[in-house]
Structures are given as structure tokens and as C-alpha cells.
């Protein structure tokens, strides 16, 4: 699809630096959960919250698809590890070590903001709104594993979706 092709081309565009003897670390990011500078939820989480706050949140599509994610603390932690370890190079998946289903993720989101997760958004509605991107970003789901980060000894600060969402929403979210 478009997204996979774009990522592949983007990553390939960095290959020539290796011929110059420059270490190349490619970070593949899952949707990042974090806060903005003012302490309010930002990024993907900011987009997911409004329906939940209006008591109409729920899974996207069937809810069975995997929903990979990562916490901003782990994005910065992984980047710091790669900067500090000249022996590491190549491609790294920046995602939580366990990927929940979309239903599990939205249940955790509802719980963290004290709202139900009961109203699914049907796939045809998402496709009508987002076209091909609905399938690529939200409906097909991916289940990457941060194996290379873990092998390098990285310890995730937010490995669990429930505690990660609570950390972002209980205090100031």
C-alpha cells in the first residue's frame, strides 16, 4: 500500500550514508501516545479522545485487528539508547512490547478517561472518511515487535497500555 511504499522509499533514501562510513539507525514508529508541552494529550491520543469524552467512544472497525502503539517516554528512551550505543545500527521498531487488539486498546482508553467503550465505528464509515488510508492505518492492523531494541537491553518505561494511558490521562488529561 501507499504507506508501506512511502516508508520503504524513505528508509532506502538513507542507505547511501553507509557508503560514507556513517552509522544508520532507522526508527519505525508506532502511533505515539504522549502529552503536549502544556500537559494535555497530544498526537494520536488527542484525536481519539473526543468521542470518548462525549460517551460515544469505541473500537474502529471489527476491533479484532492489532493496534500497535508506543509511549513518548519510550520514543525518547529508544532514541537515547541508539545515540549512546555506536554498536547499534539498522532498523528498529519503536513500539510497545505487547500489541493489544483495537478493542483492548479502546477499552483501556475508556477506562483511563472514565468513559465507556461501546460504540464501534464501522469499517465502511472509516473508508468513506479516510479512503485507502483507513485500511492501511486503522483497519488492517500490524503487530510489530521491538525485538532489536529488547536485544540491545532497552527496558520500556511504559510497556503496558493500561498504565500508559492512565499516566497520560489521570493527571492533566
For each predicted feature, which ranges?
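Glycine-rich "substrate-gating" loop/helix at the edge of Rossmann-like oxidoreductase active sites
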Residues: 1-3, 30-41, 62-70
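Glycine/proline-rich active-site loop of Rossmann-fold NAD(P)-dependent oxidoreductases
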Residues: 8, 33-47, 82-92
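Conserved beta-loop-beta element that borders a ligand/cofactor-binding pocket
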Residues: 12-35
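C-terminal amphipathic/interface module of NAD(P)-dependent oxidoreductases
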Residues: 136-173
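Alpha-helical membrane-targeting segments
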Residues: 38, 47-69, 111-141
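Mid/C-terminal beta-alpha module of Rossmann-like enzyme folds, strongest
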Residues: 78, 82-132, 166-173
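Residue-level signal for the nucleotide or nucleotide-sugar donor/cofactor binding architecture
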Residues: 5, 67-73, 100, 144, ...
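Alpha-helical substrate-binding/gating segment
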Residues: 49-58, 64-99
Amino acid at each position: 500500500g501507499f504507506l508501506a511504499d512511502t516508508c520503504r522509499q524513505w528508509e532506502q533514501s538513507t542507505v547511501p550514508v553507509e557508503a560514507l562510513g556513517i552509522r544508520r539507525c532507522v526508527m519505525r514508529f508506532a502511533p505515539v501516545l504522549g502529552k503536549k508541552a502544556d500537559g494535555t494529550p497530544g498526537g494520536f491520543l488527542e484525536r481519539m479522545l473526543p468521542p470518548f469524552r462525549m460517551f460515544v467512544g469505541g473500537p474502529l472497525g471489527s476491533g479484532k485487528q492489532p493496534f500497535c502503539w508506543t509511549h513518548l517516554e519510550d520514543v525518547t528512551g529508544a532514541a537515547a539508547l541508539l545515540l549512546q550505543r555506536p554498536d547499534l545500527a539498522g532498523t528498529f521498531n519503536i513500539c510497545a512490547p505487547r500489541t493489544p487488539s483495537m478493542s483492548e486498546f479502546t477499552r483501556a482508553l475508556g477506562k483511563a478517561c472514565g468513559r465507556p467503550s461501546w460504540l464501534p465505528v464501522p469499517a465502511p464509515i472509516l473508508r468513506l472518511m479516510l479512503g485507502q488510508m483507513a485500511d492501511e492505518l486503522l483497519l488492517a492492523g500490524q503487530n510489530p515487535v521491538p525485538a532489536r531494541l529488547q536485544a540491545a537491553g532497552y527496558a520500556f518505561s511504559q510497556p503496558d497500555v493500561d498504565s500508559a494511558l492512565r499516566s497520560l490521562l489521570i493527571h492533566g488529561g
